[in-house]
Amino acid sequence: MSLSTVNHAAAAAAAAAGPGKSFSAAAPAAPSVRLPRTRAPAAAAVSAAAVGADRAADRVSALSQVSGVLGSQWGDEGKGKLVDVLAPRFDIVARCQGGANAGHTIYNSEGKKFALHLVPSGILHEGTLCVVGNGAVIHVPGFFNEIDGLESNGVNCNGRILVSDRAHLLFDLHQAVDGLREAELANSFIGTTKRGIGPCYSSKVTRNGLRVCDLRHMDTFGDKLDVLFKDATSRFEGFEYSKSMLREEVERYKRFAERLEPFIADTVHLLNESIQQKKKILVEGGQATMLDIDFGTYPFVTSSSPSAGGICTGLGIAPRCIGDLIGVVKAYTTRVGSGPFPTELFGEEGDLLRKSGMEFGTTTGRPRRCGWLDIVALKYCCEINGFSSLNLTKLDVLSGLPEVKLGVSYNQPDGQKLQSFPGDLDTLEQVQVKYEVLPGWQSDISSVRSYSELPLAAQRYVERIEELVGVPVHYIGVGPGRDALIYK
């Protein structure tokens, strides 16, 4: 089996040749897989771009006042790019959950790469206000590092980022505990990013966590932090705790509190007031529905709700205010960490897909597991979220394959077809996937900007996905850059 010569590794290298460099270290580079390729005529690409511009304006302007971009697989679908593209038409871009475990890679107009983790992907657009909502968890040192990296690369963050006073603080001790927890689990480890996300949400649920607003009361901050340290000591034998450690941490956060103060806001009030003022809000989800604490492949999930319900609880806005929700899905499937993956490809097939798609985690650099597009899981995500449309990303990565496959149903070992996505992991791990095989396409589609210019086989692939899940594909990604997007 062979894959595309024009892959994301080549596109990223071309972008890096432009002015400036990325402020965040890129994931480990993988060798390209190169094959002869038929290129689309340049003139056709130019005319297609003109048609695409009109369609793009129509698509984006038609989005509702409060819209959302959510992942519909196991993360890493390319949500950040779509948010970056849509952001100029919105007044506010808001993160509703998660923390620095999210990794959103975007490129500015000059091709400079930015790897964002907590700061919303709308930050590259000067007129956009970025909000980190109450459902997120904030590692303050990491937050400042991200801001410093942005500003050192010419991105103005002054007065453009607000953090909810209700958001919980993620401390270094949460990260230490995360590593200890994974070590305890040994062979059954979940495969977290070890960024402390789970332990921080655990502190929130057990009600001994500290919130951003606690930084405004340093007279009691130390006592509250002491409770948190003692709890970690009692639960993890390897966690060291001393009074001097506590004093050092309190002094450190006194300095952080002064710098963070201009960013702190009652974002619940701000967002609801903005809705009253008819301002447009774009919600940027982190992770994805298949990692949802309730609906994902538990326990191999994140600790928050990256599905539609998390928008309301993570921002404090009413369900009736939410309009269009766009589900972002790769043209194939990837997963980082442990957990069942029914359509996973092993050996040479999986390796080639990983190399062509540059499938290495933005946050951890870990190689992603790769497989065919899982229609059963995608339909499940569409049901839960009520997506109004889909953004199919990385379609170009499949170029060069003689055939492409869609996992259309699950059968139990006895041959009986499952009627829904199973919540029982024992069942999920034993399913036999039934595939639908479609013809592949050989031509390079990375310069295509009009749907009609795509090879017929690629169009058929897109349309078959629409038929199977019952949701239209409005956006198609054919490369990492802002302009590498087809509006259907």
Curated annotation (Swiss-Prot):
It is found in: Plastid, Chloroplast. It comes from Oryza sativa subsp. japonica. Mg(2+) binds at residues 76, 103. Its cofactor is Mg(2+). The gene is PURA1. GO terms for molecular function: adenylosuccinate synthase activity; GTP binding; magnesium ion binding. Belongs to the adenylosuccinate synthetase family. It is an enzyme of class 6 (ligase). This is Adenylosuccinate synthetase 1, chloroplastic. Plays an important role in the de novo pathway and in the salvage pathway of purine nucleotide biosynthesis. Catalyzes the first committed step in the biosynthesis of AMP from IMP. Keywords: Chloroplast, GTP-binding, Ligase, Magnesium, Metal-binding, Nucleotide-binding, Plastid, Purine biosynthesis, Transit peptide. GO terms for cellular component: chloroplast; cytoplasm. Pathway: Purine metabolism; AMP biosynthesis via de novo pathway; AMP from IMP: step 1/2. Homodimer. Its main location: plastid. Its EC number is 6.3.4.4. GTP binds at residues 75-81, 103-105, 368, 394-396, 477-479. The active site is at 76 (proton acceptor), 104 (proton donor).
